Every structure is written in structure tokens, then in C-alpha cells.
């Protein structure tokens, strides 16, 4: 039958540490420890001195030994309880299976030898090997270790609490971040949905206006056609009659002449009447069509600005780039911070480096890119180069167009001078010659492979490893084969260059208005660097930021 824990604890209290049996005639010594009376008589003095307690090693006097009657009574009661629990009187309770005993004596390990660091039983403690050593009770020896364990345990518990706190806070932060991302997702969907609806309404509004213009033009076309057919029929009839008169014999013709009232002017019988068919496109319709074209230009500019701004702000990282002076042509002068380049017009380099442009006035950036999305700007400084002048030119052109609308319509007898046509053609040829001269003054901005060819006359096109725009007084051109004119009158002060290496695109924008100008699309396999080319006296290019 299993022994209850309280009973086993009581048995340990009434067990003699010397004989390891129940206390028989228990007595106490000076230090307070209790032993059997017969066991105390076996304790011998050490080196002729007084005997010492086997447990605490304190000396005691045998004349001070006193009986402990209460323990004797307690032993008797425990023995009776043992009988009730199915054990014979004097039989001790079994120790827990996991409790270690002395391997030599099979006794309890009550002591700890501080010299050898071993657990001892009573018999080992009294042996010659350990008698001169310092031995203390296991409970006492365990106290400092237990205290260290408890202190370390408290530290670990605090660490656990901190980790749990950090984990809880981290989970809360992650949850808050996920919640914020979800809110941002909903915001993006809602904003784009609203934007789609707005653009859809604007699209429908423009299409409705376009349909109205188409209807007006269709109706005007029918009226114009009807009036023209009627007038043509009248003239055809008169022409046919006169052709018949012209073919008459002379006598018959003169007979008809004599029958008229005015014999001197037979043609007055067929007077030349002024006709009016009307304008093919009424002035009101032309005005509305012009206003609609202006709206489309505003739409185009607005969409370019929108695309350029999103491209720059949402996808690309703005980087600071500088120029590589060793690659600069002798026609160019670089500032001390390698951010600005000026065209000198005269070759000034004393020695030609292998990586230097010789014939072409070009220069490369010192920083290259083999991945990522990066953005930088190039500013063009030159007197007379601005978008304000562009707007002024557009206004002048608009006024000229309005004047053209007022002129060019009259009656059916309006004459056209061929000399004026020849004169205008001559003016156009002169303008083309002037444009060809202006093309010589230009600059290019973009990117190039770091291995781009730098010697001799170069085309500097995508097939040569250069993706650039050319800016000139005649407008902006994509440096492709063949060269493509993009905007004849666009004059941006700053050009934004957005490079998406993995995406294989180089996008150019008006950095001030965020308008999209042009995008090159290809596959990049080499390191790319900024590229500038300047052949424009009085102009300079600056890298921003």
C-alpha cells in the first residue's frame, strides 16, 4: 500500500541520522540535534577533545544530554500508523525511487564534502577519507546554489516576461501595420475607381462634343452639296444654251441678235450673276472645332503631366550623379563639382585619353547602374530657351490662324494670285534652310552603355548604345533611326530622366510640368551611365540634384 507523503515526512523527522532507524530513547545534545541514546554513546572524542555532533560538527558535553519524551511518544504513534498502513513495526517507509543512496553503504546522502565536492552518507563522513574534510549538511550546502538558481530563475522569468511583452507589442505593431495596409489598399482601390469614373465622364463628355461637331459638319455638308448642285445645274443650262448659240451659222446667229432689244450687247441676254454657295465649314463650326482641338491639347498635356508625376514619385529613386572628367571631350569644359558642362567651341585637351570623346562633344557620368529604377534631371541654361517663349509663339500662331479664318471665303469670283503662292513657297524654303542651320546648335541628354564607342564621328543612336533626346531651337527630337521630331516648340528648362534597368525603359519627362516626353524600350545587358552631348555656344547643361 502506498505511503502518504505526510507519514513519510514524519518518519524522516524521527529517524536517527546515525543508525538510520527510528529513534530509540531519543536524546538531544548541545547543538539541538536528536539521536538514539545508544548511538550517542558510540560517538567518540576527536584527538582527546570533547565529542562532536556527527551532523554539524559542533562539540558537546555528554553530561548535557537530555531525553526528548515527546519524540519517543511520536515514534510510538508512527509505528501504530505503520501497522494500519500494512507495514511491520520498525519497517521504514520506502524512499522515492529517484532518491539516490550511497553506492558503498546504501545509506542516505546527508552530507556534502566541500573539499571533494561529493555527497556523503553518515558512514562516509566518519571514514578516514573524509573525516578531516569540511562536510556540511546537504540542505545547507544546497542553500547558496538554490539561491543562485532562484535568482537566475527570476532573471529568466523577467526575460521571458520581456520577450512576451516584446512579442505582444510586435504582434500588435504587425497587426496595426497590416490594418493600415488594408486601409491603404481600400484607399487605392477607391481613389482609382473614382479616378476611372472621372476620366470616363470626361471621355464621354469629349465624345459627345465630338459627335455634335460631326453632326454639324454632316448637316452643313448636305446644305453645301445641295446649294452647289443647284448652282451647277443653273450654270450648266446657261453654258449649254450659249454653246448652242456659238455653233449657229452666222445668218442665224445675227437673226437672234436682231431680235434682241439691245443689239449692241447680245451677251446681256445671258447676264453673269454672282453666286453664293456658302462656306464649306461655317465660321461657328470652325470656331467650335478649334476650341475642341485646344481641349484635346490640354488633355494631352494633363495626361502627360499625370503620367510623368506618377512615374517619378511612385516608382523611381532620385539619385545624385556627376560627370566623369576623363571621358569629357576637349570641346567641353566641366565645373569643379563635375555637375555642369559648357561648350567652348575650341578643342582644349593637350593629351587624348583612351576613354575620352575626341570628335563628338560628349561626356559620360561617373556613376553607373546595372539594376533598379533611378531618376535624375538635366537643366539646360541658355538665353532665349524657355517655355514662356513657346507659349508666346503659340499665341502668335493662334492669332494668325484666326486671321486665316476671316480671309479665304468670298463670292464665286474670288481670284487667287499664283505669284503669292510662289512667294510663300520661297519663304518656306528659306525657313527650312534656317531650320537646318539651327539644327547644328543642339544638345543631347540621356544614358549610354559604359562601353560606348568614343572615337571618330558617331551617330549616338540606340544601336550604338545611346538612348538620348536632342534639344534644339527647332524642338525636341528622339535620337533614333530615322530621327523623330516629338515636339516642335516644346522647350523644357529641365528634362527628367527615369531609368528602369530591369524593365528596359528610359523615360524622359518635363521635370517642371511633369509632362511625359518620350520612352525608349529595349533590353539592357551592360552597365549604363548618364550621357550628355553639347554643341551649342552660350549654353550649358547642369545635373540635378
From Swiss-Prot:
Boundaries of every B30.2/SPRY domain copy: 301-545
GO cellular component: cytoplasm; nucleus
N-terminal signal peptide: none
Stretch list, region Disordered: 382-443
CDD domains for this protein: Bbox2_TRIM10-like, RING-HC_TRIM26_C-IV, SPRY_PRY_TRIM15
Described purpose of this protein according to its UniProt entry: E3 ubiquitin-protein ligase which regulates the IFN-beta production and antiviral response downstream of various DNA-encoded pattern-recognition receptors (PRRs). Also plays a central role in determining the response to different forms of oxidative stress by controlling levels of DNA glycosylases NEIL1, NEIL3 and NTH1 that are involved in repair of damaged DNA. Promotes nuclear IRF3 ubiquitination and proteasomal degradation. Bridges together TBK1 and NEMO during the innate response to viral infection leading to the activation of TBK1.
Family: Belongs to the TRIM/RBCC family.
Name listed for the protein in its UniProt record: Tripartite motif-containing protein 26
Organism encoding this protein: Mus musculus (Mouse)
Lineage start: Eukaryota, Metazoa, Chordata, Craniata, Vertebrata
